[in-house]
Structure formats: C-alpha cells, structure tokens
Amino acid sequence: VTIPAGWALSRKNMPGKKFLMMYFIIPMFFGGGLIPFYNVMSNLGLINTIWAIVLPSILSVWNLFMTKTFFESSVPNGLIEAAKIDGAGHFRTFTSVVLPLAKAILAVMALYYAVGQWNSYFNAMIFLQDESMYPLQLVLKEILIASESTVGGSGETILQQYRLANQLKYVSVIVSSLPVLMLYPFV
C-alpha cells in the first residue's frame, strides 16, 4: 500500500494532493488514543485474530513520506512522459517504468516493515487473548517475567536462579535478534 500511495502523492498534477497530505500528517502527529482504537478493532470483529496485528501496520505514514520523497527525487518526468507518448496508462507506467527504478526503496520498505512487524508486541498484547497466537516478542516477554520470580531457598540457590534468569535473558535477546541480523546484509 505504501509504494503505490507514495507514487500517487509524488505526482504534481494529482487532484486533492494537499488534502490527502494533511489527512495523513495530522493523525501522524496527533494519535486518536488507545480506547477508540480498541473500540474500532472490536467493532470490526478483529479481536483475537491475526488481522488485529496485520491491518494496523499496513501503512506507515513515515514510510509513505519516504517513498513519496524518493519518487519525487529519483524518477525523471521525462520517463513518465515517454511512457504516456507510448500509450501507457497510469498503472502500466507504474508497473513497467517506475517499479524497476524503485528497487532501492522497495528493499528499504520491505526491511522497515519486516523489522517493524518483528519487533511489534504492543498490538498483540492488547488484541490477542489466545496465547498460541502470540508473536515471539510477547512469548519472550512472558518467559522473562516468569524467570524474574524467585521461589526462595538458601543464598546459593537464589544466586543460581539469578544466574539462570540472566542467561535466559541473554539467550532470548539473541534468539529474537538473530533473524533480523541475518536479514540486514541482504537488503
């Protein structure tokens, strides 16, 4: 959704461009609040579904402005005019001319959205009650909270529990960071 919207907003002759820009900018700075957000998700029947996690992150306004700026600065108007002369419509121009030139922004947006989804836990914490649907970060949070509690015993036992809890924290951080670290060199 971000790439086509960024392309559309980058066109100088798009009708209603200023209105749409304000439509995106105002909610970016002034959030509507958590309770209305929960009510909307509840009224749409998305509570305890995977869509409660996917749909809110389908468009990032910051990423939209990055793609808009990329298209404004990197796609020459001469190519767009040449495509029009050759008989290409808006969709054909976008898919055949613009997208091949936009591989860099496509890779960056894929990385940003992937890392954002990977690190996301707050929406899952609010909208998911079924623990089998929890993302990795929420499962790791539960493990870390459970490892913090000490049952008691002698000083040596408590020290061993503390060391084990610290090791569990470090392993959790590595496990949750490894896929993203493996992805970065290829983007």
Residue ranges, per PLM feature:
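A hydrophobic, multi-pass inner-membrane permease signature
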Residues: 1-187
